[in-house]
Amino acid sequence: VRDAYIAEDYDCVYHCARDA
C-alpha cells in the first residue's frame, strides 16, 4: 500500500515540477 502512496506523491511532484 506504501508503493501506491509514493507513486501518487511522485506523480504530483513530476507533474507539479513540469508545470512550474
Swiss-Prot record:
It comes from the Eukaryota. The keyword Cell cycle does not apply. Pfam families: Toxin_3. GO terms for cellular component: extracellular region. Residues 2-20 form the LCN-type CS-alpha/beta domain. Expressed by the venom gland. InterPro entries: LCN-type_CS_alpha_beta_dom, Scorpion_toxinL/defensin. Keywords: Ion channel impairing toxin, Neurotoxin, Secreted, Toxin, Voltage-gated sodium channel impairing toxin. GO terms for molecular function: sodium channel inhibitor activity; toxin activity. It is found in: Secreted. Belongs to the long (4 C-C) scorpion toxin superfamily. Sodium channel inhibitor family. Alpha subfamily. Binds to sodium channels (Nav) and inhibits the inactivation of the activated channels, thereby blocking neuronal transmission. Has the structural arrangement of an alpha-helix connected to antiparallel beta-sheets by disulfide bonds (CS-alpha/beta). This is Neurotoxin BmK 18(2). It comes from Olivierus martensii. The lineage of its organism: Eukaryota, Metazoa, Ecdysozoa, Arthropoda, Chelicerata.
